[in-house]
Amino acid sequence: MSDTFQRIAPEQARQLRENGAQVVDIRDPQSYALGHISGSRHIDNHSVVDFIAAADLDAPLVVVCYHGNSSQSAAAYFIQQGFSDVYSLDGGFELWRSVYPADTSTGEAE
């Protein structure tokens, strides 16, 4: 089990996602609704406890924010909560959207 997260580029995040990694988006609900990585799950301070309770702590977890800054703190938090394979997306959703515009979706969080 690692006690630190890894910062990764969109290319690595996409490969992890294609191999079944959970992708969580920690941006505000309005930003998520306007655009997010396809298949990602929106979480906030209210839903994080339920997410952790239901999550596979050993499965890869990619954390996404706006530009890759806030996701680092969130990734460290997930490590503290027992996740063993955590990544922070460098450049955040903004870089992802510029690199993979076809791999984005819009709409409210489920």
From Swiss-Prot:
GO cellular component, one term: cytoplasm
Molecular function GO terms recorded: thiosulfate-cyanide sulfurtransferase activity
Main location, first listed in the record: cytoplasm
Highest rank taxon of the organism: Bacteria
Gene3D superfamilies per the UniProt record, alphabetical: Rhodanese-like domain
Similarity field: Belongs to the GlpE family.
Protein name, per record: Thiosulfate sulfurtransferase GlpE
UniProt-listed HAMAP family: Thiosulf_sulfurtr (MF_01009)
Active site positions: C65 (cysteine persulfide intermediate)
EC nos: 2.8.1.1
Enzyme class: transferase
Organism: Pseudomonas paraeruginosa (strain DSM 24068 / PA7)
Domain Rhodanese, residue spans: 17-105
SMART domains associated with the record: RHOD
Protein localization: Cytoplasm
